[in-house]
């Protein structure tokens, strides 16, 4: 249940339920058949009582927890209904009479279903064009791509067996409104839902999203804040392989909702997270994720107007409202929900058209630099040509794109969702040609990432691949923070860049012959240009970030022999290859620990140069302060100045290929902390 129960939560019900000798199944049936106004209260009271009634004297399980555990085992191990009924009969005969368990599968299911944890199955087009709901609920074919709603049974089509229609794709959706209403069905969670207004400490420090500017701006714009019980939500989603087989490509997407009204030590607990839907695989929904979000958006629109809900604290009904503040995703998933392409010239969703990037011809990748724009106007780095890209920087830091700006860029554009259908209106002939074969880019096309397939220069608005479904929410356009950057994955990518480059790990290093040849084409840092010997062979000179074999042999044993407290990190020693002096197979938390705690210490006796050592220490301090549970608002401006200087120092030392979009995105993290609160 979404609401956690404790001993104090049932005091009001104890006196009325002193007698434990009762027919539980009949009580639930009678409660369910009662009048609509008292139905929920009667069932909930019964659940509270049975959650604290021992199955029999001396048993460690309560009556309800024992039944839920049994039903959970049935689902996990695929027990048939007959076997479950037989087991219930055996248990009823074996246990003391006061256990009074249901005798059949039907009776057990009847009780479990009253928990309200049901979901709705919604058929979907196999090409992610539409959901078969509303006006399309009775259709057998998708009106966009003409795909069948049903799987094709070859044996049935040949007459070998009777045809049984099975949906090609099914979305499992968990209704949101009853789950939010449940948070107010007990005084424990009902009081916690007002904590952000009544219990929050206001001392100028960031501890909770309510301390951030985005929350306060939302309150100023709307009358939503008039009632502290109104719910603020965050949405998180990402793909994963539920089968645990890395050789099998499968991506199932759960969508989670987080109620931010709760205190920070409660809202991120597993019991508080709400599973909104499960988007089926085997392929990622990509930009078509909006199709699957339709039921959630419909409920959010209803919740914005208000839904009558009973509050256990005041023992009165009130119009409950809810709003979605933002989403939290890794960078690829952010592109799917935002609709902004996170690759190519304008990959940064914050800078948008003001993204400063260029294509490295030899390395065949994009480079995102130009961080001197965030420096003060008269800073000396702005005028130093030789240390940077040979230019004087006069530009100013770009402003983050607002929702109004995005809608302006979408004006006049139309999109069609679904696989193998045009992203904008095109002729049927063009669609057929594109769907027949995916054409590979030629080398000429790769050279200029701003040119489309027609050879025309691509405009910044072409990076918008759709109009996000979130803009259907009347308040979304004006939300100051709509899509959060995932600090965990950004930190992992930055750490991998450092580890791969310092240890020269094959496939992960950002340095190499092509990276140095790009320096030649850019006319930058002649001391790092490749050296050609008498036989015509090219070699690359050592850079300030190049570690010698001896230095690597000092660093790797330190990491391999490191002993940490239990639960602090995984066994990082297994990732160390002493033969090649490399690190492989690091998880996100391993990179987090390495960058913040281990590298600043482990590199002290073997750093390649003082400049690199200084950068590592600065990055460690940056992420440590950024990821603190309590952030001092007065220190954030200094933190922003620090990361800008660090990025500029990195531009002086590292080759351009080092500057992937993840490295650039660090410059926006402080702003997001100001808006949304601590990480």
Predicted segments — roles?
Residues 2-121, 131-133:
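N-terminal alpha-helical interaction blocks
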Residues 596-606:
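Extended amphipathic alpha-helical scaffold segments
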Residues 21, 32, 52, 79-83, ...:
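Membrane-entry segments of alpha-helical transmembrane domains in multi-pass membrane proteins
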Residues 57-65, 79, 116-120, 266-269, ...:
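Helix-boundary capping/turn motifs
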Residues 99-545, 613, 617-677:
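Domain-level cores of phosphate- or acyl-group-handling catalytic modules
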Residues 25, 482-485, 492-495, 516-519, ...:
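Membrane-proximal termini and loops of membrane proteins
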């Amino acid at each position: 249940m979404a609401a956690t129960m404790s001993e104090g939560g049932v005091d009001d019900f104890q006196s009325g339920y002193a007698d434990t000798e009762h027919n539980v199944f009949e009580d639930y049936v009678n409660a369910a058949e009662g009048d609509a106004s008292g139905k929920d209260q009667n069932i909930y009271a019964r659940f509270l009582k049975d959650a604290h009634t021992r199955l029999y004297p001396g048993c460690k399980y309560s009556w309800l927890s024992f039944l839920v555990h049994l039903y959970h085992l049935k689902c996990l191990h695929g027990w048939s209904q007959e076997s479950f009924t037989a087991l219930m009969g055996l248990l009823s005969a074996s246990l003391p009479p006061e256990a009074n368990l249901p005798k059949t599968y039907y009776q057990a299911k009847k009780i479990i279903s009253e928990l309200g944890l049901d979901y709705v199955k919604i058929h979907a087009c196999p090409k992610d064009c539409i959901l078969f709901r509303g006006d399309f609920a009775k259709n057998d074919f998708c009106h966009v791509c003409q795909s069948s709603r049903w799987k094709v049974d070859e044996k049935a089509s040949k007459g070998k067996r009777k045809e049984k229609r099975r949906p090609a794709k099914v979305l499992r959706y968990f209704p949101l409104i009853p789950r939010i209403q449940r948070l107010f069905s007990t005084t424990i969670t009902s009081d916690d839902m007002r904590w952000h207004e009544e219990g929050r400490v206001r001392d100028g420090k960031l501890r909770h999203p309510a301390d951030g500017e985005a929350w306060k701006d939302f309150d100023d714009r709307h009358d939503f804040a008039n009632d502290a019980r109104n719910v603020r939500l965050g949405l998180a989603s990402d793909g994963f392989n539920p089968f645990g087989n890395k050789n099998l490509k499968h991506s199932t997407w759960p969508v989670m909702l987080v109620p931010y009204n709760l205190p920070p030590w409660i809202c991120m607990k597993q019991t508080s997270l709400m599973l909104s839907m499960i988007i089926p695989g085997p392929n990622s929904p990509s930009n078509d994720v909006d199709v699957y979000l339709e039921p959630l958006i419909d409920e959010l629109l209803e919740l914005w107007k208000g839904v009558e809900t009973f509050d256990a604290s005041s023992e009165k009904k009130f119009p409950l409202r809810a709003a979605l503040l933002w989403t939290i995703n890794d960078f690829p998933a952010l592109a799917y929900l935002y609709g902004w392409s996170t690759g190519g010239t304008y990959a940064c969703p914050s800078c948008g058209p003001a993204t400063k990037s260029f294509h490295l011809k030899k390395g065949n990748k994009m480079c995102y630099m130009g961080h001197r724009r965030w420096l003060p106007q008269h800073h000396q780095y702005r005028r130093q040509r030789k240390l940077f890209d040979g230019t004087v920087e006069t530009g100013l830091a770009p402003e983050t794109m607002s929702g109004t700006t995005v809608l302006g860029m979408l004006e006049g554009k139309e999109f069609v969702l679904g696989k193998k259908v045009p992203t904008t209106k095109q002729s049927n002939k063009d669609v057929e040609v594109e769907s027949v074969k995916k054409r590979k880019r030629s080398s000429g096309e790769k050279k200029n990432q701003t040119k489309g397939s027609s050879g025309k220069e691509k405009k910044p608005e072409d990076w918008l691949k759709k109009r996000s479904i979130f803009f259907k929410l009347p308040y979304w356009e004006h939300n100051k923070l709509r899509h959060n950057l995932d600090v965990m994955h950004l930190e992992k990518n930055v750490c991998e860049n450092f580890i791969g480059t310092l240890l020269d790990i094959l496939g992960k290093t950002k340095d190499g012959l092509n990276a140095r040849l790009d320096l030649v084409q850019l006319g930058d840092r002649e001391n790092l240009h490749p050296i050609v010997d008498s036989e015509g062979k090219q070699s690359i000179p050592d850079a300030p970030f190049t570690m010698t074999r001896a230095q690597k042999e000092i660093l790797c044993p330190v990491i391999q022999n490191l002993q940490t407290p239990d639960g602090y990190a995984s066994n990082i020693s297994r990732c160390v290859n002493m033969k090649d002096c490399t690190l492989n197979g690091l998880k996100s938390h391993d990179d987090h620990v390495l960058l913040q705690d281990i590298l600043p210490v482990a590199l002290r006796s073997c750093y390649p140069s003082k400049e690199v050592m200084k950068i590592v220490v600065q990055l460690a301090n940056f992420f440590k302060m950024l990821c603190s549970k309590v952030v001092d608002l007065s220190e954030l401006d200094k933190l922003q100045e620090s990361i800008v200087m660090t990025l500029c120092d990195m531009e002086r030392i590292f080759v351009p290929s080092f500057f992937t979009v993840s490295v650039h995105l660090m410059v926006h993290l402080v702003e997001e902390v100001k808006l949304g609160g601590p990480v």
